[in-house]
């Protein structure tokens, strides 16, 4: 049996992150760890250590799909791991992230007001006001939280859907962070 490490339990972090965001939207900022740490490790380590060992979301999909048998364990369609789909999804994802940052800027500039809602699948507006008390922080900080949590929750739901339909970690085949870190590693290894 393989020895367990502390990082084998980071799937708990994924659950805690989403639970905290459900109770207080400002905890959404913790998700920046999942954005910055993989890039930092790829740039300075030249590998995908985060994806292979530290990704709580990937571990959660493994737990649910394999250990709890929530996955059909069907082969992942090849197009989901194809270069055109992965980079296309990355571009789409970064566009949505850029739009979220722009909306945050508009709130900070006073051009629009705070929207106390999250958007699932970048389309469906879900009231989420109970998670924030107006005036706790400046409006732009709260706006970023709502937008970022929307992005994180949508990607979790997409990951759960493909986990149920295919292999437990199908999300990892086209995860935007995985695609970016893979690109960074390829560039670093050419040096």
Put a short name on every predicted segment.
Residues 1-191:
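Non-ligating segments of multi-cofactor redox enzymes
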């Amino acid at each position: 049996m393989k020895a367990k490490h502390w990082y084998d339990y980071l799937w708990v972090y994924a659950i805690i992150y989403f639970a905290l965001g459900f109770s207080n939207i400002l905890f959404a900022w913790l998700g920046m760890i999942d954005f910055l740490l993989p890039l930092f490790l790829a740039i300075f380590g030249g590998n995908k250590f985060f994806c292979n060992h530290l990704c709580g979301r990937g571990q959660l999909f493994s737990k649910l799909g394999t250990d709890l048998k929530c996955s059909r364990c069907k082969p992942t369609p090849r197009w989901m791991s194809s270069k055109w789909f992965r980079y296309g999804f990355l571009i789409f994802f970064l566009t949505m992230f850029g739009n979220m940052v722009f909306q945050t800027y508009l709130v900070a500039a006073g051009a629009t007001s705070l929207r106390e809602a999250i958007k699932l699948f970048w389309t469906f507006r879900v009231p989420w006001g109970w998670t924030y008390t107006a005036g706790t922080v400046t409006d732009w900080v709260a706006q970023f939280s709502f937008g970022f949590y929307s992005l994180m929750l949508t990607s979790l739901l997409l990951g759960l859907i493909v986990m149920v339909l295919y292999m437990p970690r199908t999300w990892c085949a086209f995860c935007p962070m995985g695609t970016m870190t893979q690109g960074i590693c390829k560039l670093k290894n050419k040096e």
